[in-house]
């Protein structure tokens, strides 16, 4: 079983993403871990927790989602975890290329 992390500081958005993921036909193949804080997610990653996929808001209250992705790639050397960014803001689009999110 693989794990998917959902990180958004807005509970309504996290809940909606989790609801959509939970309706997937292969739901029994993965577990969902939710985070309301980029810092808590980073602590989990630094502690060695592995996720197949991070669904990550760009504008978090305590941490920029782009920074979380950059630390995942550069500090932790994790190039295997897929990163899917969600945001209503377009100003970060060019920064995302450095983090290599899902195409």
Segments the model singles out, each with a brief description of its role:
Residues 8-10, 88:
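Acidic di-acidic motifs
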Residues 14-22, 41, 68-73:
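Short, well-ordered amphipathic alpha-helices
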Residues 30-35, 80-83:
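Glycine-rich, flexible loop segments associated with nucleotide phosphate handling
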């Amino acid at each position: 079983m693989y794990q998917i992390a959902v990180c958004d500081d807005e509970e309504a958005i996290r809940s909606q993403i989790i609801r959509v993921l939970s309706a997937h036909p292969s739901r029994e193949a993965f577990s969902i871990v939710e985070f309301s804080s980029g810092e808590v997610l980073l602590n989990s990653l630094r502690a060695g927790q592995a996720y197949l996929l991070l669904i990550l808001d760009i504008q978090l209250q305590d941490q920029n989602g782009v920074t979380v992705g950059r630390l995942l790639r550069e500090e932790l050397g994790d190039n295997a975890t897929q990163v899917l960014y969600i945001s209503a803001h377009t100003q970060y689009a060019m920064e995302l290329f450095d983090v290599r999110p899902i195409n």
